[in-house]
Amino acid sequence: MRKSLVCAGALALVLGMPSGTVQAQGMDDLHSKVRVGGRVCMADHFHDGSGTGSTRARAQAAAIRAWIDFTAWEYGGRWGSYGAAISKSMSCSGGPGNYSCSTSARPCRY
């Protein structure tokens, strides 16, 4: 019982940390990295994002925003640049008034 309480307390402490603290503790070091130009990129780790919208452009923007938000939350703002990411893919479906898009990319930072 005591071990469970200690584990629960540690989990609550980690979950309560701001994303900058997570990055400062090296959570991005869980993945191997490679240099691509002036960037440092995750070697084989992809992040995904999905979104919907009334137009294809809005659905794509929502998918990119989801990718940015999750990546920055997990590794910190420096990793949350979709413009810096590599190996990007985007797929969309639907039609006028109801589009859905998904994107995948390897995070990079400058």
Model-derived features: where do they sit?
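Bacterial N-terminal signal peptides
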Residues: 8-16
